[in-house]
């Protein structure tokens, strides 16, 4: 209720509503909504006040959101680039991933990740990165991933699971 919540959301505008949205404290219960009017501490980054709704000012895409209920602030960073970096490429430069809007995942083929360790990072920067000891529970600033493979899919939005996870084939 008064904590800091972080996560990825996918904003699309299939109905022409201008990429506007609200959060719900309880799924399906609009009486528990959190909207832009509640953010007395401000809205920063790639979101703005959309007249009661949050508005994704950078348009359709995936965003990393930090919602601070204690200070009533919201910050959002648009994921312009999701990348994979690690031992397999000497930790130098990202393997770019593409967004698959049908499956709600970022994917890369021929990534060539190795068991030597690797991570996901947003916008070629370490400020937002994901790792983990298991593929089915990735976290911010988590441990290096130690699974080898070619095709990597990252599911960040929690649409298909309560956790952020990836698959490696």
Q: Where on the chain are the PLM-derived regions?
A:
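Insoluble glucan recognition modules
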Residues: 1-169
């Amino acid at each position: 209720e008064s904590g800091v919540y972080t996560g990825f959301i996918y904003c699309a505008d299939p109905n022409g509503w201008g990429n506007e949205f609200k959060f719900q404290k309880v799924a399906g219960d609009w009486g528990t909504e959190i909207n832009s009017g509640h953010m007395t501490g401000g809205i920063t980054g790639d979101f703005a006040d959309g007249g009661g709704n949050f508005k994704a000012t950078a348009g359709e895409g995936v965003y990393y959101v930090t919602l601070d209920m204690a200070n009533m602030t919201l910050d959002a960073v648009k994921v312009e680039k999701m990348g994979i970096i690690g031992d397999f490429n000497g930790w130098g430069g990202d393997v770019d991933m593409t967004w698959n809007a049908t499956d709600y995942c970022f994917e890369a083929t021929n990534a060539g990740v190795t068991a030597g360790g690797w991570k996901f990072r947003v916008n070629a920067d370490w400020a937002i990165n994901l790792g983990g000891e298991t593929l089915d529970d990735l976290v911010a600033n988590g441990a290096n991933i130690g699974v080898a493979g070619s095709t990597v899919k990252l599911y960040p939005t929690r649409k298909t699971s309560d956790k952020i996870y990836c698959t490696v084939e």
